[in-house]
Structure formats: C-alpha cells, structure tokens
Amino acid sequence: MDTKNVIAAISLSAAVIILYSLFFAPSPKELKDLNQEKTALNSEAPKLDVSEKIIEISREDAIKDSDRIKFENENIKGSISLKGGIIDDLIFKNYTETLDGQNNITLLSPKKFSQGYYVETGWVSSSKNIDLPNSKTIWKVDGNNKLAPNQSVTLSWSNNQGIVFEKIIQIDENFLFSIDQKIENKSNKSYDFYSYGQIIRNKSPDITNFYILHEGLIGVFDDQLVEEDYDDIKEKEFSKNASSGWLGITDKYWITTLIPEENKEFRADFDFKNKFRANFIETKPLTLVSNGSISSNVRVIIAAKEVDVIDNYAENSKISK
C-alpha cells in the first residue's frame, strides 16, 4: 500500500470516529445513567449469613431477647424488635388454631425461633466506607413508644459520620404497615443509597398440596403474576426488574407482602440460602448531598386472606391483585 493510500485510510477512519462521536456515542449524562444502572444491578439487599444456624429456643425467649415497641389494632397485635427495627412478632386477634377459640394464630416470629418469619427494611449504598444500620443495629425510640392507628412511632439511629437514619412507622385498622425511611446528612460528603425490603422465613410451613392453591413465594410485577414453590426456589433463584407491583410469601389463609414505593423501579429476588427470602431493592439511587435529606416509603401488608380487605387494599392503595 503506497503512502497516499495509507493517508486516505487513516483519514477515513478518523472521519468514522468523529461521526460516531457526534451522532452515536452516549452523552456524559447517558454515561452517568449507564454507570448508575450498572451499580444498581450489582447492588442487592444484604446477604444472609448462610453459616447462621437456626437456634432452637422458644418463641417466648426469642421475644425477650431484644427491647420492643408494641403495636395493636382491631385485627392484629404484636411487637417490633428495636434490634434491627424488624417486624417479627404478629398475632391475629380474630383467628384461632381451633374451633373452640383456643390459641390465636401466630404468623410472624423472631429469627432465633426455629419457625422464624419476619420483615426487614433498610438501605444499602454504593458509597464505600459508610456505616449503615443492619439487623444488629439498636434503634432508639423518639417519643411515642406504642404503635396504633393514628399513632405513629419514630425510630432513629446515627452513625459516627454525621448520618441520621429514621423509620417512621404507621399502622391502619386492618393489616397495613407504612414505613417511611428517612436519611439526614450532617456531613460534608455525598452518598448514593438504595432502599430495600425483605421477608425472611426460616423454614417452609406444612403445605396443603391442594393443586389450585399456591403456597410459597409470590409477586405481581408490571401486572404479571409470578408464583414460586418452596422446592422450586431451593433449586433455582428468581429475579425480575419491574416498575410496579408487590412481592411476598403466601400461606393457605395468610399472606405477607412488601409494596415498593409507587413509581420507583426495583428488582425483585426470590432465593434460598438456608432460609427463604423474598426481597426487593430500588434500582435507581437516591443521592444524599451534604446537609440534605432523602426518603423512601415501603408498605407491608401482613393479612388474613379476607376478600373484602384485599379488594379494598387493591382499590385504594393501587395494589395489583
């Protein structure tokens, strides 16, 4: 190839690169969005410690293991552990184990009990070297210490980096908890956060095995119903990105669900690592600037499968059935 041809080839290559840069290459904003999406995909709710053994202690002793705030309305009663801010004690007041009215139905229990079944909410961050609240964090009660309809409870925790975390928890007259998670930044740094929620169950319950009745992990994602049996999740995990919906664990008569904040994209995961887990994490970060604040809402429904109640939530809370 002579010198003229070499120069022509180089010129043509340069022209192609320039044209691509002008018309096809992603803009700085698009690159930032792509990086954020990549970060979100690599972020996930906190890993369960697969080496953690289920400690065979009584439910009563497990309840006593941490300080608690009590909650009660016309349908449910129980408590929230201040260690982790976990909903792990829930009893149905109007349903009993036997026809003679003995022993109210207990659904949620602490993780140290063999039949542990509980709900956690919180934050993860793509920012390194930041202390975050976790399942062992001891939350402080600010003000009112009993949760009831029209009587919220505020929990707070501060790290040593100038970041203050809050959970403002409300309950309605039936089965709905609303958790507003807030973070205030008193430092001179900025951080990215992703809100998450997860339902964890130590063991699968006794299954009815009635072919038209699903018991296991369940969700509706962008109007698509997903049902996964306990045995199926042991063999293969499930993951799906969505912009609307809910997820949870369902029994024959009871259901525990998480509802991510409306109009926020999230990824849902069902998995088993010594425990069953249904969780979601928002896939777009909230940036917490210096002297700023951010918030995210998670709704939790822990309910008896009463048709009227479920229909009411579906209609008034925009929850897909």
Where are the language model's segments positioned?
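Aromatic/His-enriched, Gly/Pro-containing loop or helix-boundary segments
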Residues: 1, 40, 142-144
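Membrane interfacial helix-start segments of signal peptides and signal-anchor transmembrane helices
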Residues: 1-9
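Hydrophobic membrane-insertion alpha-helices, especially the h-region
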Residues: 10-21
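Juxtamembrane extramembrane loops of integral membrane proteins
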Residues: 13, 24-107
